[in-house]
């Protein structure tokens, strides 16, 4: 599966939106990849996550103990990817604004791959790495369905992206005029 295949799946699900969006990262964009529109279709989700699992297998030869997803956005892709890898899926969730591995205990040194839906700045992955290291995990890599940075983001561990697709985003104080004129919509899940 390549980048165009991923984009085609998003198009098939009518999941590429245009307007003025405030991303989960806080940055602004004229394009929003509404992964919920994809994830509501089990067949499309299965295709993406099977492709991601295959890419993870090609990239990581050593044993992986767990796949971990950051709640909320990473829950579905991490679970489905873990199913294709044949290993357990766990998640971190926010407690007082900070990710914690709340519902699970892992053995010290457990080899973990973080799976996320879409990466823009990589903040959720970096926060997930911190939570997992605090829980004793060895985070060997992270993975995502779509890297919006086009491969430029640094998440602190290797990032395996099923697709890299650079979508321009802006700081709130650097919006182009045509974007600033549109009302902003914030569809993300960071503060839920």
From Swiss-Prot:
Under PROSITE patterns, the record lists:
PUR_PYR_PR_TRANSFER
Q: Where does 5-phospho-alpha-D-ribose 1-diphosphate bind?
A: 116-124
Q: Which EC number(s) does the record attach to this protein?
A: 2.4.2.10
Q: Which cofactor does it need?
A: Mg(2+)
Q: Which reaction does it catalyse?
A: orotidine 5'-phosphate + diphosphate = orotate + 5-phospho-alpha-D-ribose 1-diphosphate
This protein's superkingdom?
Bacteria
Q: Which is a GO BP term held by this UniProt record?
A: pyrimidine nucleobase biosynthetic process
Report the pathway entry. Pyrimidine metabolism; UMP biosynthesis via de novo pathway; UMP from orotate: step 1/2
| Function statement | Catalyzes the transfer of a ribosyl phosphate group from 5-phosphoribose 1-diphosphate to orotate, leading to the formation of orotidine monophosphate (OMP).
Return the protein name: Orotate phosphoribosyltransferase
Origin species, per record, is Bartonella quintana (strain Toulouse)
Please name the taxonomic classification of the source.
Bacteria, Pseudomonadati, Pseudomonadota, Alphaproteobacteria, Hyphomicrobiales
